[in-house]
Curated annotation (Swiss-Prot):
GO BP terms: defense response by callose deposition in cell wall; defense response to bacterium; defense response to fungus; defense response to insect; flower development; glucosinolate biosynthetic process; glutathione biosynthetic process; indole phytoalexin biosynthetic process
Name this polypeptide is given: Glutamate--cysteine ligase, chloroplastic
Inducing factors: Down-regulated in leaf trichomes under salt treatment. Up-regulated by the fungal pathogen Phytophthora porri. Induced by cadmium.
Any one Gene Ontology molecular-function term assigned to this protein's record: glutamate-cysteine ligase activity
SUPFAM superfamilies named in the record: Glutamine synthetase/guanido kinase
Observed phenotype of the null mutant: Plants are characterized by a recessive embryo-lethal phenotype.
Organism of provenance: Arabidopsis thaliana (Mouse-ear cress)
PTM info: The Cys-186-Cys-406 disulfide bridge is known to modulate the enzyme activity according to the redox status. The oxidized form constitutes the active enzyme.
Activity regulation, per record: Feedback inhibition by glutathione. Inhibited by buthionine sulfoximine and cystamine.
Pathway membership: Sulfur metabolism; glutathione biosynthesis; glutathione from L-cysteine and L-glutamate: step 1/2
Phylogenetic placement of the source organism: Eukaryota, Viridiplantae, Streptophyta, Embryophyta, Tracheophyta
Top-rank taxon, per record: Eukaryota
Location(s), subcellular: Plastid, Chloroplast
Length: 522
């Protein structure tokens, strides 16, 4: 879901020309003005972590006290004053902010995030908040994580550059540290699952790796005590029919990857969007709703098609010749806001735009101007299939068992971090039309790899793509290609994980979804 995703680390203006294409060099190299924090990048490094980000590190702006391993912050995000510009922000500053994500290739990292459903083993019911609080406290005390509080409620944990956070329906999320290899990424996932299981088992709690809540109704799901979610819950039904399901009943796995320049960002963005439906098919794992088959292989993916058209989708403008950081900023400026954060409170700004905010004409905060923190927060409320912040997020996959949590980043690292594979993907998809990309996005949640495409099936494209991913990993030289074994059989047979679940449901499970809680238990 990535509702909380916040860019980590601080940011800096890149030297002229490092992250630019013709026509934007001046903007990129000179966009951010009068920001003392820009020198802090070396001090803090870079992180993909979602919970506290830069803001929690800038001590002048966060009132906090430490007692043992408890980190008290006013709320999440901790403060609206974290990054203070001495002059009003301009559109050029916002462009430069995105451009500041450019890194040299030796600094490329892999940031993996995944969500899972906690449930009572005896009843299969979703975890309640008091159980989640007990679990978070237990993990903090046993494994030395810092607690993140909103008021007097524990809402997450932090340890180094990793964080654990709660999605609106109590989905438990690990936002991993930015790591160099997939071996490190998979070890991090396994360590996290071990820690969670060690505490949860004693409480009679299990965790389920699936893309959509298979058994319980929306009204059975507990709501987490986080201020921003109240605003979103009130707004969602106004803009789509499935937004509340997205918030409360979905789980995803995603990977965050770096780019070296604006041109490199564009190439990776286009490749990621074109192939996102293939990732959706390979990891499709949400065929049940309220105890029965729902007609989809990825209900989670389908839900995004009727959540909020203003902030979701396949972003056809990314394929325009004119696309770059500037065009993404213009898109984001006109995506309606959810909230601003002032004086430890969330202010409802739904339906208003950041463009109005930039002009000091936000009806919910008349005369006020935005900070970088406001911009960071706004970028996290945009939910396309690939999202740009100071890195790119691949957002098309369902949550699943641990092997697939390692396979998803492996798939994208092999394709996007290897120049030959990336070029091959761009060549392969160069003549795909916007209508074809949209068709795949809409049909794959129903028909998976059996979706007809041109003269064959999507399965045949996936075979070529998986080979490119493996080749890309081999060329990296870290012996990482084995992480793709979890999706080998899916591509070879054309049978998605969801179709295997449906086969068991109609066979040995006797048309009950209850066995899925054991089948996909972490």
């Amino acid at each position: 879901m990535a509702l909380l995703s916040q860019a980590g680390g601080s940011y800096t203006v890149v030297p002229s020309g490092v992250c630019s294409k013709a026509g934007t060099k001046a903007v990129v190299s000179g966009g951010v003005r009068n920001l003392d924090v820009l020198r802090m990048k070396e001090a803090f490094g870079s992180s993909y972590s979602r919970s506290l980000s830069t803001k929690s590190m800038l001590l002048h702006s966060v009132k906090r006290s430490k007692r043992g391993h408890q980190l008290i912050v006013a709320a999440s995000p901790p403060t609206e004053e974290a990054v203070v510009a001495t002059e009003p922000l301009t559109r050029e500053d916002l462009i430069a902010y995105l451009a500041s994500g450019c890194k040299t290739k030796d600094k490329y990292r892999i940031g993996t995030e995944h969500e899972k459903f906690g449930f009572e083993v005896n009843t299969l019911r979703p975890m309640k908040y008091d159980q989640i609080a007990e679990l978070l406290n237990g993990i903090a005390e046993r494994f030395e994580w810092e607690k993140v509080m909103e008021g007097d409620k524990i809402i997450g944990l932090k340890q180094g550059k990793q964080s654990i956070s709660l999605e609106p329906g109590g989905q438990f999320e690990l936002s991993g540290a930015p790591l160099e290899t997939l071996h490190q990424t998979c070890a991090e996932v396994n360590s996290h699952l071990y820690q969670v299981k060690a505490v949860a088992e004693e409480m009679g709690i299990g965790f389920l790796g699936i893309g959509f809540q298979p058994k319980w109704r929306r009204e059975d799901i507990p709501i987490m005590p986080k201020g921003r979610y109240d605003i979103m819950r009130n707004y969602m039904p106004k803009v789509g029919t499935l937004g509340l399901d997205m918030m409360l009943r979905t789980c995803t796995v995603q990977v965050n990857l770096d780019f070296s320049s604006e041109a490199d960002m564009i190439r990776k963005f286009r490749a990621g969007l074109a192939l996102q439906p293939i990732a959706t098919a390979l990891f499709a794992n949400s065929p049940f709703t309220e105890g029965k088959p729902n007609g989809f292989l990825s209900m989670r993916s389908h839900i995004w098609t009727d959540t909020d058209k203003d902030r979701t989708g396949m972003l056809p403008f990314v394929f325009d010749d004119s696309f770059g950081f500037e065009q993404y900023v213009d898109y984001a400026l006109d995506v309606p806001m959810y909230f601003a954060y002032r004086k430890n409170k969330y202010i409802d700004c739904t339906g208003m735009t950041f463009r109005q905010f930039l002009a000091g004409k936000l009806p919910c905060l008349p005369g006020e101007l935005p900070s970088y923190n406001d911009w960071e927060n706004h970028l996290t409320t945009i939910f396309p299939e690939v999202r740009l912040k100071r890195y790119l997020e691949m957002r098309g996959a369902d949550g699943g068992p641990w092997r697939r949590l390692c396979a998803l980043p492996a798939f994208w690292v092999g394709l996007l971090y290897d120049d030959d594979s990336l070029q091959a993907i761009l060549d392969l998809t160069a003549d795909w039309t916007p209508a074809e990309r949209e068709m795949l996005r809409n049909k794959v949640p129903v028909t998976g790899l059996k979706t007809p495409f041109r003269d064959g099936l999507l399965k045949h494209v996936a075979e070529d793509v998986l080979k490119l991913a493996k080749d890309g990993l081999e060329r990296r030289g870290y012996k990482e290609a084995g992480f793709l074994n979890a999706v080998d059989e899916v591509v070879r047979t054309g049978v998605t994980p969801a179709e295997k679940l449906l086969e068991m449901y109609n066979g040995e499970w006797g048309q009950s979804v209850d066995p899925v809680f054991e089948e996909l238990l972490y």
